From Swiss-Prot:
Record protein name field: Acetaldehyde dehydrogenase
InterPro entries: Acetaldehyde_dehydrogenase, Acetylaldehyde_DH_C, NAD(P)-bd_dom_sf, Semialdehyde_DH_NAD-bd
Active site residues of this protein: C127
Keywords per UniProt: Aromatic hydrocarbons catabolism, NAD, Oxidoreductase
Residues that bind NAD(+): S12, G13, N14, I15, S158, A159, G160, P161, G162, T163, R164, Q165, N166, N276
Pfam families in the record: AcetDehyd-dimer (PF09290), Semialdhyde_dh (PF01118)
């Protein structure tokens, strides 16, 4: 019985390269067979070859030519994934989408991964979504969240061409994620690229307005969620205790909790300041491993 599942990474930029190192760093059920880009001179492809991974500038066509690849991590762009999704589905390959395209259902590992392990396309929302939606969900499972707002500040140096092309998709998809997964009646997302040098760590301010909530229960739920995310993103942490207040909000005067979150990257390929990219690749690996394990179990019982 096969104990691994062959996977490929589509996109050889910062995110694709960091994901490659994460998969190679701890080999379990994912067998990285290929990394495919479109630029023959890509640093990511050169690094893949140096690690003994088959690298090609043939893009999605190269991946589709290999029937043994069962899972594809798409680390390109939202517009590109809209084209890739249909072709991957037709080829019977599971797509784990690291762009804001949102063709498949939104997935945040500690919140709803197990609900979607059987889907042929899952979407990891955005870096800001992976960072802040768990906290909004932590409040919504013990209170009625009327409004959630997040401001994500990331180092400008960590935002490559793909990130910059996806700014509009980022705000829309993250806002929807705060609602659909986080449980807020209304969500709002803002991203800021900070050019400071040395680069700052990813910082997120999360503002949650709620009804029918107990401070102690909310604090406990948030603490448990922080612990859950740290299992795959060790650098995920609050900068201080939750701040409770009562304020005027877009939904009227309500109780609010304000959270200051910092994400430090693991430094597998990207600098530790690129926590915004690290949380995406760590989440992708987590999702890929769970889906791969299910595929193995299905094969063993067939």
């Amino acid at each position: 019985m096969n104990r691994t599942v062959k996977v490929a990474i589509l996109g050889s930029g910062n995110i694709g390269t960091d994901l490659m190192y994460k998969i190679l760093k701890k080999r379990w059920v994912l067998e990285l067979s290929m990394i495919a880009g479109i630029d023959p001179q890509s640093e990511g492809l050169a690094r893949a070859r140096a690690e003994g991974v088959y690298a090609t500038a043939g893009g999605i066509d190269a991946i589709l030519e290999d029937p043994e690849i069962k899972i594809v991590f798409d680390a390109t762009s939202a517009k590109a994934h809209l084209k890739h999704a249909k072709r991957l589905k037709e080829a019977g390959k599971v797509a784990i989408d690291l762009t804001p395209a949102a063709v498949g259902p939104y997935v945040v590992p500690p919140v709803n991964l197990m609900e979607h392990v059987d889907k042929d396309n899952v979407n990891l929302i955005t870096c800001g979504g992976q960072a802040t939606i768990p906290l909004v969900y932590a409040v919504s499972r013990v209170a009625n969240v009327k409004y959630a707002e997040m401001v994500s500040t990331v180092s400008s140096s960590s935002a490559g061409p793909g990130t910059r092309q996806n700014i509009d998709e980022f705000t829309f998809t993250t806002s929807r994620g705060l609602e659909v997964i986080g449980g807020a009646e209304k969500g709002k997302a803002i991203i800021i690229l900070n050019p400071a040098k040395p680069p700052i760590l990813m910082r997120n301010t999360v503002y949650i307005a709620y009804e029918d909530g107990d401070d102690h229960q909310i604090r406990h739920s948030i603490g448990q969620m922080i612990h859950d995310v740290q299992q795959y993103v060790p650098g995920y942490r609050l900068k201080g205790e939750p701040i409770f207040d009562r304020r005027e909000t877009p939904k009227g005067r309500l109780d609010v909790v304000i959270l200051l979150l910092e994400v430090e990257g693991a430094g597998d390929f990207l600098p530790v300041s690129a926590g915004n990219l690290d949380i995406m690749t760590a989440s992708a690996k987590q999702v890929g491993e769970v889906i791969a394990k299910r595929l193995i179990e299905m094969t063993s019982t067939a």
